[in-house]
Amino acid sequence: GDEVMGIYDRLHQILPGHPEKLFLLAGVNDISHDLTADSIVSMIRMTVERIQRESPDTKLYLQSLLPFDESFRRYKKLTGKTDMVPEINAQLEVLAKDHKITFINLFPLFTERGTNVLRKELTSDGLHLNEEGYKIWVKALKKKM
């Protein structure tokens, strides 16, 4: 995984090629660095605006953050931060609307019903998807293409 500014800093390797489509999903690793939801969304906004400025014909898809499951206790820096994900996602949806880009809300596909927690059968470590999780993700993306 990467952080939002890591992606931003590598855009110079991608944007000169003017990709037809670009799928952006970033932010969960930034949560582990004690950043606020607002600061994470602000960095994603900078990234979106740079993509639109430097490659205006690229169709940009902004994906929601995926949930995680703290009960695995593998990623200590995410402890107590489960509820930040829907807060960030709500702001990302507004960001997408304001910038006239497609927002793909993946979050509800991956959560335990009635919670903000990643379904246990879709992960082996509480953060990263397993094969079953990737199948759900691919299916969701194909619906939007």
Sequence positions of predicted segments:
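Alpha-helical cap/lid subdomain in secreted, periplasmic
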Residues: Y8-M145
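A short beta-strand-loop structural module common to alpha/beta enzyme folds
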Residues: G1-E3
